[in-house]
Regions:
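Conserved catalytic-core motifs of eukaryotic protein kinase domains, centered on the activation segment
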Residues: 61-62, 130
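Conserved CoA-thioester-binding segment of acyl-CoA-metabolizing enzymes
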Residues: 1-56, 69-70
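Crotonase-fold acyl-CoA enzyme core
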Residues: 94-208, 234, 241-242, 246-247, ...
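C-terminal alpha-helix plus adjacent terminal tail
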Residues: 1-9, 43, 56, 67, ...
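Terminal peptide-recognition signature
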Residues: 14, 18, 32-33, 51, ...
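An acidic, glycine-rich surface segment that forms the CoA-thioester-binding/catalytic face
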Residues: 30-38, 42, 65-108, 140, ...
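Short, active-site-adjacent cap segments at secondary-structure transitions
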Residues: 56-60, 66, 112
């Protein structure tokens, strides 16, 4: 399987395992991963996910152009249909899939094109020292199609986003850290251990509260402040009625570690 999906107690680990093509993805593999993400979303025993790439060279380099096809005319001929490939699902991690469980991107190498866009669609990004980032689609005659043109200018200064989008400029892990695109840069050998450490810190919190906090952020970011505050209040009332809040309050009073269940 190109997308390895492992369940390690409360943590789901997704590994893009296609190193011969720098962990690029075909439309069929995007569909496979989306099915795994839906399983992760619905599994109440899984609280947080980690996304990484196999090997030490590439995290993901986006869509595999050899399998995706293209709309240009063949040499010496008229424009024809793109080579057949299984269609990608309408809802994916990068577009449309509602997923309130947090995802950590453990960027172990090249994150170019759609691979960078996958990392941008995650909630927290950690990077190995050798990681590289870039929206390189314009160098191939394309524009970002997995959300890069929309997410990146919302995350970093517009001018820097323009450099990356309009010039296909690549940046290293330290510059990504300086731009707050990644939360921490670590040696390659420590990357997955660090990602799991951060995931476990999330798992120490009440899962329903974590998922609802992410929902509040994601839904509220495009709202007016007034509408966002109303949303926060609505979601806050939901978690205040939860078993986890009752357990958290009881554990606080009894000075013990809470036993959260996600309800």
């Amino acid at each position: 399987m190109t997308i390895e999906y492992k369940k390690e107690e409360k943590i789901a680990v997704f590994t893009i395992n296609n190193p011969d093509v720098l962990n690029a993805l075909s439309p069929a593999e995007v569909a496979e991963w989306t099915a795994n993400l839906i399983d992760f979303r619905e599994d109440k025993n899984l609280w947080v996910g980690i996304v990484t790439g196999a090997g030490e060279k590439a995290f993901c380099t986006g869509l595999n152009l050899r399998t995706a096809g293209g709309g240009g005319p063949p040499p010496g001929g008229q424009r024809g249909p793109a080579p057949s490939a299984p269609p990608a699902p309408q809802e994916t991690l990068v577009k449309g899939l509602k997923l309130w469980k947090p995802l950590i991107a453990a960027v172990n190498g090249y994150a170019f094109g759609g691979g960078f866009e996958i990392a941008l669609a995650c909630d927290i990004r950690l990077a190995a020292e050798n990681a590289r980032f870039g929206l390189t689609e314009v160098t191939l005659g394309l524009i970002p199609g997995w959300g890069g043109s929309q997410r990146l200018p919302r995350m970093i200064p517009f001018g820097k986003a323009a450099e990356m989008l309009l010039m296909g400029k690549r940046i290293d892990a330290q510059e990504a850290f300086n731009l707050n695109l990644v939360s921490k840069v670590v040696p390659q050998k420590d990357l997955m251990a660090t990602a799991k450490e951060w995931a476990n810190q999330i798992c120490n919190c009440a899962p329903l509260a974590v998922w609802t906090a992410k929902e509040a952020m994601m839904r509220g970011i495009d709202m007016t402040l007034a509408d966002g505050l109303n949303l926060e209040g609505e979601l806050g009332r939901k978690v205040m009625a939860s078993k986890d809040f009752a357990e958290g309050r009881k554990a606080f009073m009894e000075k013990r570690t809470p036993n959260y269940i996600g309800e």
